[in-house]
């Protein structure tokens, strides 16, 4: 029986079963050692998720936001280092079914989104 893919708790990317996890697949939570070291999302990650959802709540149901808007909401003066954490937060929200990632007006899989993205509520 094939093993279904998992979603990394840290970065929100999907990952597939690997032979090295054969004995412990039920307990694997992270896609890589780097994500394992970073651990489960903390307070800042939750603030970013909340900022994304709050920004979308403030707009029309069909509106989109740029990830940089969420980063600026959390840290107005030093938002650039938060861009990758915002993308991670967005991927986790997609995994929860609370968000869609859009490029060029089309929904994209979080694992395949490269370059500029927009975030919106599911339709």
What does each model-identified segment do?
Residues 16, 36, 40:
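Short functional micro-motifs and their immediate structural scaffolds
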Residues 95-103:
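A short, conserved structural fragment
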Residues 62-73:
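Short acidic, hydrophobic short linear motifs in intrinsically disordered regions
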Residues 8-11, 31:
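Short cysteine-rich clusters marking metal-coordination/redox-active sites
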Residues 43-64:
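Positively charged, polyanion-binding regions of nucleic-acid-associated proteins
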Residues 71-83:
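Short helix-coil junctions and helix-kink-helix linkers
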Residues 19-28:
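Short linker/helix segments within small regulatory modules
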Residues 105-123:
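Short, cationic-aromatic polyanion-contact patches
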């Amino acid at each position: 029986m094939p093993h279904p893919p998992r979603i990394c708790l840290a970065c929100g990317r999907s990952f597939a079963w690997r032979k090295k996890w054969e004995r412990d697949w039920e307990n694997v939570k992270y896609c890589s050692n780097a994500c394992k070291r970073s651990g489960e999302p903390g307070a800042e990650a939750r603030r970013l998720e909340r900022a994304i959802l709050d920004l979308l709540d403030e707009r029309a149901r069909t509106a989109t936001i740029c990830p940089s808007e969420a980063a600026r909401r959390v840290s107005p003066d030093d938002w650039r280092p938060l861009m990758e954490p915002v993308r991670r937060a967005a991927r986790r929200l997609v995994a929860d079914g609370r968000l869609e990632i859009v490029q060029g007006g089309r929904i994209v899989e979080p694992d395949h989104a490269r370059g500029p993205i927009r975030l919106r509520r599911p339709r």
